């Protein structure tokens, strides 16, 4: 990756130019607990909306609460400046339940997002991602 982020971040978004675009327009946070455990990029969307563009946890630390802790850090640090925290993800049985457990609810869908914006098919749990599902939670 051009920014030296390593494989952790790329695991969550295989299209490197998309990651670079997020980084050019956003702010990156790293959760370091005796080594990097989780990374997240947020951007100022519009109309008091803060958006998580990508969040990635080192595989051996997944399921240990690091991503949830990073989301709560963002909520606590931005609630005075924004009213909504938003995230877009593929319609996946892995990610949607995670965000719902973190207090997000489904907001809207962008049809064919992964088809139109990625140069190759993206699969998660054996399912090809097609639409972008947006979820939101109040700050």
Features from the language model and the residues they span:
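Single conserved hydrophobic/aromatic residue that forms the stacking wall/gate
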Residues: 1-5
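Active-site loops and adjacent core secondary-structure elements that bind or stabilize anionic groups
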Residues: 8
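A short, internal acetyl-CoA/4′-phosphopantetheine-binding micro-motif in the GNAT/acyltransferase core
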Residues: 55-62, 90
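Conserved GNAT acetyl-CoA-binding A-motif
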Residues: 77-91
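Conserved catalytic-core motifs of GNAT/GCN5-like acyltransferases
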Residues: 86-88, 100, 105-126
């Amino acid at each position: 990756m051009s920014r030296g982020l390593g494989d952790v971040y790329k695991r969550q978004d295989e299209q490197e130019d998309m990651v670079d675009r997020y980084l050019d327009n956003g702010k990156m946070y790293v959760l370091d607990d005796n080594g990097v455990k989780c990374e997240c990029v947020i951007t100022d969307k519009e109309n008091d909306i803060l958006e998580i563009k990508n969040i990635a946890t080192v595989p051996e630390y997944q399921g240990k609460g690091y991503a949830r802790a990073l989301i709560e850090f963002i909520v606590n640090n931005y609630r005075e400046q924004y009213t909504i925290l938003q995230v877009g993800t593929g319609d996946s049985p892995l990610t949607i339940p995670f965000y719902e457990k973190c207090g997000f609810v489904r907001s809207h869908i962008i049809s064919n997002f992964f088809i139109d914006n990625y140069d190759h098919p993206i699969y998660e749990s054996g399912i090809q991602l097609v639409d972008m599902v947006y979820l939101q939670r109040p700050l």
